[in-house]
């Protein structure tokens, strides 16, 4: 049936055959069109009209959907963000000049991980393509999956950033998932050997889009050779990945995939950085969620996250780098102090900080501007934005060279100074491009007058052709002396010089006869012929020349892409340092001390996010942890009193400190933490068929299997999703395990309502009890938000229920039930004591199963005592030492009557 198709439809099917798993955007004049099943998909996803045109292979009417070519930046991101791949099939020649059907071809394939248009992702986020390589090593890991050796690479083609790492030790599967959570790639590619691993693919697909991709190489050795060719180096040792076999393989996979989709060399990807998970604090996906590092739990936006609380950066590069620093806090005390030195200097010098941030506000997204320039997707407005950005750099550089003292600031200044051509490039753009150019680079109007004599002449000809013809006619009259000479034009002969027969003897020798008429002859000269061509094509030539000039400028800029990217990174780092200094000064943060020991000492610590959102001030609290007496802090207290906030703020202060930020405290000393683990909140994983309790246990297993003596563990209510006996048993076992792990145990904060756990302080030497103080005022409960030593025996659940708006009838009934349970507990305890042994009756079992502690207990450790029952009040007034046996018996009968 192909003979029934038009030539254009045959082109479409050829493109579809080459890219069967990809939607085709097929350029037809002023539209991108799609046909068949692609059209149905596009119409549905973009909510546009589905029509029909022509016939398909079977002779049926062909479904059609199309969008205007100028609206592609609006529609394309919607498809990419839904996980589709889109092949852009462009017209490869001017339809006006085409002989026959217009040549068309796929010029790039846009996938989630290879998008370069800024409309497809936020300025503050990287758009990573992740490539994974590896193999099974046979044994089963702690989490139940097969142990693997993995190489991971992350490539952001919009900025040129390229990273690789490798995990060959135990727990590599969990480390892979942690990197996935931190880097948040838009797309992940796997070789066929790993794509067949359903466990791996399913876990990856929980967080990103997964594609199968087989690079066209024979193996790891060829991958290394291909990378050397791309980077124009003889060895990969300088990049630190020479011995990372799977890292190298994954790196080439990512690069080949990007080259295949973009159909160009990607020269701006000019270096590969190797990193190790031993360089950074590990924050897995659970911890990132629970601590709301870059996204909040409520709607996964960035408001009310740590990142948004600290992010007042001036540049997109700075926003992205700040996010990276928070996701990857450092482990090296020396490197952390380099950052802190720079922040301290900028915080202490407000004039320097103000000037730098003022200049930074002029800087646009240099990284992505350079990426678009190298890709050939930039327009003249991008060049103007780059020029304005480069104009600010010399002022920043000179200011730092003159005033900066911190090593990191001086390094930035020296790096900026090493790019000596920066002013020249800015000047080149400024001389050539108008200040407010049009969006299109194919329609002219972007090059300044005076930049090119040829362009000025073409423009002059195009706009002043009549004046030029009149001037030429007068010039020829004066030269020949023929007063009747005139210049004419027709579509057949073009421009000509007409001389009457009476003046034919005066015709100069350089006139060339074009046409003989009855009363006159028509001539042309080489100059007129040249001008005729210019006049007739002046506008087209002017537009073409403007594009040629624009292309020459972009090629010059592309040749400096590496230096421009390095400049962008230095500017971004400076932006983060200045931002952290600004936040520190505005919020009264202090410089933390970092140590190699296991101590954590925080005075007047505050939760950075909560502090920024609450009115009336935040109640600060101290934290003291070490490996001797304060390794495990057991925190009790009512719901809503602030236990979770207290635990989270401790972790956030440590993360901020190791990221290089000042912290919300009057004093902070942090023994470097290698991992932060959290078990907070209750979530069902319905998609995986996991209950709340199962999710809790999976997270707990990860903590117990992977936490080290340098880790920090936050546990909030272990065992809530099961029976009280089971929950308490698990919670107690966890405390003992973490306390006794290794020689010094693992630093942990554990918030619990299992008040019997507080007795562990007497049995385990490094467990310390703390509680959140509250105050009862009549029926009201006041949360003091202050953490104080000792345990509490009350949860104040009914008080909290009242605060939550539970109907008063329910509250009253709950109090009645509570008093009944307390009365049963007193009676059971009395009988137990009388029998001299523990009772195993139904009432005791039922009550203990619910509460696990004596609600009438008076341990003396609680700061706030609840209201006394009548029996308790009577007992409290008794002076047993002064009572006779008969009086005691009578009082006992009275108490029994009170109990009913």
UniProtKB/Swiss-Prot annotation:
Record Gene3D superfamilies: 1.10.1420.10, 6.10.140.430, DNA repair protein MutS, domain I, MutS, connector domain, P-loop containing nucleotide triphosphate hydrolases
Gene Ontology terms, MF aspect: ATP binding; ATP-dependent DNA damage sensor activity; damaged DNA binding; mismatched DNA binding
UniProt-listed GO biological process terms: mismatch repair
InterPro entries, alphabetized: DNA_mismatch_repair_MutS, DNA_mismatch_repair_MutS-lik_N, DNA_mismatch_repair_MutS/MSH, DNA_mismatch_repair_MutS_C, DNA_mismatch_repair_MutS_clamp, DNA_mismatch_repair_MutS_core, DNA_mismatch_repair_MutS_N, DNA_mismatch_repair_MutS_sf
Coiled coil ranges: none
Keyword terms: ATP-binding, DNA damage, DNA repair, DNA-binding, Nucleotide-binding
Source organism, top-level taxon: Archaea
Positions that bind ATP: 637-644
Biological role: This protein is involved in the repair of mismatches in DNA. It is possible that it carries out the mismatch recognition step. This protein has a weak ATPase activity.
Family per record: Belongs to the DNA mismatch repair MutS family.
Name used for this protein in its record: DNA mismatch repair protein MutS
Source species: Methanosarcina mazei (strain ATCC BAA-159 / DSM 3647 / Goe1 / Go1 / JCM 11833 / OCM 88) (Methanosarcina frisia)
